[in-house]
Amino acid sequence: MLNFVILGGTMKFAKSAGIFAVILSLASMTAVWSAAAQDQHKAQIDALRKSLEKYQDYKVAVRDLYLSTVGCIHYSGEKIAGHMEYAKGAMGVHFVNLTVKGPPDPMKPNVLIYEPVGKKLKLVAVEWLVPVTPETKQAPTLFGQTFMGPMEGHEPLIPKEFVHYDLHAWLFKDNPLGMFAATNPKVNCKGYDFELLEKPTRMMHGH
């Protein structure tokens, strides 16, 4: 009887050890896949950053049909039920290219974002704005990131009827909240002639 109990315990231990080994193997494979995906995204992001360097001069952006919405947007961190949650910080001055349409192109964001620094504008981030249409089935993704939304347009700069998804990428300024966060606490709108403290945008459920 004792031998059976010991043998049974050994069998259980071996079975548990086998399951544990499988779990470790799967975890290792997942880590490898994740690292490979991150490397791929990093290569894409590095290529994107390099291709956009020319827009450090906002006049080049304007010539390429990125038009300024003038206001420097920032948020207080206020939370309102049914609205997007934006951490305290700024988004900056948006330059929108209305000629860029269709599914989000990782190498062609339709928004460039600048921070006013003294009398100049410094390129700090980019954004992809994707309007919600009857054909939209789910939130888009880029670089392994799911777009935020759907939400109304950011009044007064964008009509609230412009229901959309968006994704920011802070390619040219470090963001302690993360590269793909909507706001950046290191971006400053204070002293800018067209400083706009916005309320969080209303979420649009059911789209």
Residue ranges and their predicted role:
Residues Q38-H207:
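Primary mode marks residue(s) on the alpha4-beta5-alpha5 output face of response regulator receiver
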